[in-house]
Amino acid sequence: MKTSLQIAAEARLEPIAAIAERLGLPVRYLEPYGRYRGKIDLTFLDDYHDRPLGRYVLVSAITPTPLGEGKTTTAIGLAMALNRIGKRAAVTLRQSSLGPVFGIKGGGAGGGYSQIVPLVESILHLNGDIHAVSQAHNQLAALTDNSWYHGNPLDIDPDRIEIRRVVDVNDRFLRQVMIGLGGKQNGFPRQTGFDISVASELMAILAMVNGVGARAALRDLRSRIGRMVVAFRRDGTPITAEDVRGAGAATVLMREALKPNLMQTIENTPALIHAGPFANIAQGNSSILADLIALRCADYVVTEAGFGVDIGAEKFFNLKCRASGLWPDVAVIVATIRALKAHSGKYDIVAGKPLPPALLHENPDDVISGGANLRRQIENLHQFKVPVIVALNAYPEDTPAEIDAVAHIATTAGAAGMAVSNVYAAGSAGGVDLARLVIEIAERPGPRPVQFLYPLEWSLADKITTIAHRIYGAAAVTFSPTAAAQLAALEDAGFGNLPICMAKTHLSLSHDPALRGAPEGFTFPIREVRLSAGAGFILPIAGTTVTMPGLGAHPAAHQIDIDDEGNIVGLF
C-alpha cells in the first residue's frame, strides 16, 4: 500500500468554496487562504443561530499504545462514510502540533485513504493559529517579567511567576532554564522553563471560547485572557494578564486564530480544524466554536477527543460540554486487536521499533485478557449516560476469531453494537457499516440525559478523587505537600468551583504507563496543581507527566527531507 503522503499527493481536491457549499456554509462567510484552505467568519453564528443542530458524534478510544490506534483516522472515515450513504456530515478536529509531527506519533491528520488534505499544509503551520498562540503567550510572559523589572509595581513574587515561555517543538532541554543572566541590563536571574505551545493556557482558552456570534466570541476570548493568572504577589494574591496590561495585546494577536479553519478530507468531506490542546496535559478537544458552526450546517458532526476515554472523553464531557451546553447523541470507542493484546501485559509495543512478531499471530485469549481495558472504557462512557458503539479499526492480520472476541467483549460490556472499520485501506467504503450503526443508535427516539461526573460545588480534592476513583479505577489519591498547599490556596482565592483537567499519562488508565489493562488497587499521586483561570479549570499533575515532551532516539525528523522538485519525503 502507498504511504499516506503518496496517497495525499494523488488526492483530487476541490476548491475550498466548493467544500463550504458541501458543508452548507454560505460562501460569504468563507475567508480563503489559497485554493484549498480557509477560515470561517464567526458572523455565521449570528446570522444562523436559529438553525437546528445536527447530530453530534464523539469518537474516543481505548487506552492507546505508543503508536496510536487510529482514532483520528476513524473519525475522518466515519464522516466520509456518513456522506457516502446520504447524510451531510463534517468532522471537527484539533490542529496538529509540530512537536509530534517531528517527534514520533504523527500529525493527527488521519492516514491512508482517510485523512485531511492537503496533508502537508494541514500539519505544517496550517493558517498560523499555533504561531499566534505562541506569540501571544510569550508576549504575556515578557510583559510579566517586564513589570517585575521596572520597579515591580504589582509586587510580583519572583518565585511565583507562573507563566513560562512556549515553543512548538519537542525539546526536553528547555524544561528548566535560567533567564536574566549577564547583568541587570538583561533582567534579573530566575529559574523558569518552556512548555510546548499546545500546552499553553491560551490554546486551552481558544478551544473553550463560546458565544452566539462573532462579538460574543471575541468578548469571551478577551475576558478569558484577562483572567489568566500569570504570577502571584508576595501576599499570595493572584496577578492576571489584565493586571500586567497584556490581555488586549494578546487578544489582538489571537483575533484571526479565533476563526475555525476549513479543510477537506481525501473524499472532499468538510473538516473544521481548530485549536490543538494536548489531551494528556490540557483538555484535548477541538474548539467549541468549530462544533457550533458544523452543527448548524451538517446533519452529523463527528468530533474526536484525544487519547483514551479516560483522558479526552472525560474532559469532553466535564469541561467542553459543560461550557458549550452541547451533548453527544452517541459515542464511538476505537479499538484495535493489537492494542487489546498489548493490554494483556504479554507484549511490549515500543515507538520506533518493530512490533513483536508474536503480536501478529492469532490469539483470541489474549484479546479477551486485554479486553478489560475496553470494558472499563465502555463503563466510563456509560457514566455519562451516552450510548456507546465500538469501532474495531481493522488490520490485515486480524482473524475472525479475534474479531469475534472483540464483539463479545463489547456486547457483554453493554455497548450498543460493534462494527469493523477499514477506512484506512478503503476510505468511506470501509466505514459504511460503522456509519449505519451510528445512524441507527443516534436516531433512536428517547431522552438524552445530561450527566456530569461531579457537581462544581464539590471541593477540588473531592472532584479529583472522583475522577481517579470512578474513571481510572484508583483505590486512593495522595496529594504531595506542595499539591495540598496549592489546593488550599486555590480554594481560599475563590477558585474552588472550577472543574478539573487532569494531566496524566495517556498510556495507562493509571498514572503509571507500565500498568496496562484495567488496573485496580493503585494509589493515584498528585504532585502539583496549576490554575488555568482563563480556560476555566484546575490542572492537577499526576506522576511524571511533563508539559514539554522530549524527542526519542530516532525522531521522525530524521526521515523528513525534500527532493530537488520540492516534494516532501518521509513525512508519513
UniProtKB/Swiss-Prot annotation:
Highest taxon in the source lineage: Bacteria
Top-level EC class as recorded in UniProt: ligase
Gene Ontology molecular functions: ATP binding; formate-tetrahydrofolate ligase activity; methenyltetrahydrofolate cyclohydrolase activity; methylenetetrahydrofolate dehydrogenase (NADP+) activity
Keyword match Nucleotide-binding: yes
GO biological process: one example: tetrahydrofolate interconversion
Binding site for ATP: 65-72
Enzyme Commission number(s): 6.3.4.3
GO cellular component, one term: cytosol
CDD domains found in the cross-reference section: FTHFS
Keywords associated with the record: ATP-binding, Ligase, Nucleotide-binding, One-carbon metabolism
Catalysed reaction equations from the record: (6S)-5,6,7,8-tetrahydrofolate + formate + ATP = (6R)-10-formyltetrahydrofolate + ADP + phosphate
UniProt-listed NCBIfam families: PRK13505.1
The protein's name: Formate--tetrahydrofolate ligase
Taxon lineage: Bacteria, Bacillati, Chloroflexota, Chloroflexia, Chloroflexales
